[in-house]
């Protein structure tokens, strides 16, 4: 019952809002806890992983600057010898298109501080950056891919496509004790699906759950479907004549000159694959000798044009000589060059795509505005 002065009786006060006592109890309950650790999991806003990541973020940014720049900090571990280039990380919080960490495969939480490489599409947790074994492969130029090797290779040396680097790294990490690499085939559908995912290049793939034979078939299919083979037709004669010398030093000098005549993407990819196949030939558990590798990859490296028995035998002989070259010979072609300024800290991987879309949309808007004013001027002149 409400009195004349407008005040409510205690009996009616209980029926005003059934939610109010519950909120008061929660506030009283929260005031009883003095620290965040005393709260139960039900009342916590962040999990333990988020708190650790936020603490790492504070430790890496002691000055408290707003830019959150990570220049000069050593994130990547030097223990993994397969890394061709160190990642150039940038701290970023994602509010849309949130993905998974490349290393642990766990979800990067909404608005949580994480690391993203400026040169490649790699994203990971801050705590996982020192355990990464994924190579940093800068993305190729944005444009239509016509099937040439240079279309899939980065713009800086070593110009090896990301598909080959990621597959080779995973094969060497898990498959050097597995028999029949590059000899045992996989299903065509699995290989095709993996190749499309790797060539799309929108995110760094996780290949830990892929079969090693599928990875090997993906490498072979990629080399077979190139418009120009790894050793182009107009360079066959140079390699054939270089391997006919009897003196070992003469052969090495002639092969060196023949390799230098190749395009840089072909040269770097050939050197990278030779080092990989040499490791496979040296592993007794794989049971793939130099002769077996030459038989398998001779038609793939030289192309299927003029595929006669005599040419295949010649290509196998050339490939045997290339595989028997010392590892230091091929390592000299894989020198890591610094990234250009367009891929530096001020103009990174995602900014290239955003900048392109912004330019296209702004140009369309400006042309429409100019068209509108021109039409208005023409309309006014006709009425005059």
Curated annotation (Swiss-Prot):
Keyword terms of this UniProt record: Developmental protein, Differentiation, GTPase activation, Guanine-nucleotide releasing factor, Metal-binding, Spermatogenesis, Zinc, Zinc-finger
Matching SUPFAM superfamilies: Cysteine-rich domain, GTPase activation domain, GAP
A single GO molecular function term of this UniProt record: guanyl-nucleotide exchange factor activity
Species annotation: Drosophila melanogaster (Fruit fly)
Biological-process GO terms, alphabetical: cell differentiation; compound eye morphogenesis; mitotic cytokinesis; mitotic spindle midzone assembly; Rho protein signal transduction; spermatogenesis
Protein name: GTPase-activating protein RacGAP84C
Record lineage: Eukaryota, Metazoa, Ecdysozoa, Arthropoda, Hexapoda
UniProt cross-references to Gene3D superfamilies, sorted A to Z: 3.30.60.20, Rho GTPase activation protein
Annotated site, Arginine finger, chain positions: 183
Pfam families found in the cross-reference section: C1_1, RhoGAP
